[in-house]
């Protein structure tokens, strides 16, 4: 099944980019690595959200980007980011995402907007629909704290309004944040935490990432780490989590 998903993911990325001719060398720029939503159900006691927002790294991108992420739980995420309008410092882009469960059935779909700054700061808003749950509306921000030729440090935060379809279950919020570190666009790490007061639940993550391959238009990134959640009734162990992301930039820079 994993091999099938790997082949399917590569076909989706390559077929999308094959329609365009790339005229610019993007070597040295950071590549889109979307945080795909995991879309488990709230009532099953599993994480029901992720930072489903893509924000730019220190260099603002002016080309369309597509990505496929294969997760260790068998799920799969597709992401797209298409520039709409911008100038030398800021770019406004349209976002799109589709997440599939381990049976390749739709787990969520989302659309949104992202505003990226050349210095690595960004804002985004995204609306997601989760079959069997309801809708989620997420606003997120990212600030590039430090950047030079070797090191990059960013802080991020988000708030998600969860709007379940279940009778007698009110809307509720999830808030969270984290810190990302990258060394020479090759090796990095991230720490994250989220809090859902309505469920009296906290989620934690500690991840590492490695850029396996990079060309002017293509990037392959591996991430691995641990996640856990705490509630008054149950506390999970630190569970291993890993994924592989294929990213592709295509089209002419405008």
From Swiss-Prot:
Its main location: secreted. GO terms for biological process: defense response to bacterium; innate immune response. Keywords: Antibiotic, Antimicrobial, Cleavage on pair of basic residues, Immunity, Innate immunity, Secreted, Signal. Hemolymph antibacterial protein. Belongs to the attacin/sarcotoxin-2 family. It comes from the Eukaryota. The keyword Secreted applies. It holds the Pfam family Attacin_N. GO terms for cellular component: extracellular region. It comes from Trichoplusia ni. It is found in: Secreted. Residues 1-18 form the signal peptide. This is Attacin-A. Residues 19-62 form a propeptide.
